[in-house]
């Protein structure tokens, strides 16, 4: 009983982790407009297509670094301040006849890339896998194919940028699906603790009747036990997709960021066929 409760707790924590992670990512990704204080806007990283030149911020907007005269050094200097260890410069943004003063953080390309990564993660879809046999008609010791529609298996990108005196500094972050995983309960008693796992590179292969029963797939799992012993009569599993995160920037710098996984729960009913003796 303790093992069963532990398995249920692990699956529940996984679901909560996915939910909280999605809310957290959406909150961070939507925080690109910042806030305002004393009539001045505090801005985060800008989202979308960057300007094509140092002064253009779209078809009718311009960004200008604001300066002030410093008597101590005898010439003008840009207006800046440090908040939580990050230095912000004050820019004037003009769009037609309207303008606003906006504090823009000084960030390295990798920091802008991480902001874009938050946007990408918020856009990644939860996987929807197919199974053969179907989840309601699986059989012990009979291989199960699982796969993702190839049209779903495509990269997802986002671009973030900040204005600088040298023109916009942008970073483009791309998440590329690389691995499909399947984790499931697979125990023979109502209190057992056996678990099953399989993974493969790529989206897997779609099963077709013309392939026959002896064909193999890189994405395949074979249940060892029937699910009839479970109180619900089924096994709970998780299908996941691992995404590789990479980025490029306007400076030529680029690299990779920690991979990310999207997941979804699946329910499988596994029967055990009894041989007939004549």
Regions found by a protein language model. Give the residues of each.
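N-terminal export and membrane-targeting signals
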Residues: 1-12, 26
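Extracellular/lumenal mature domains of secreted and surface-exposed proteins
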Residues: 24-278
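Bacterial N-terminal signal peptides
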Residues: 9-21
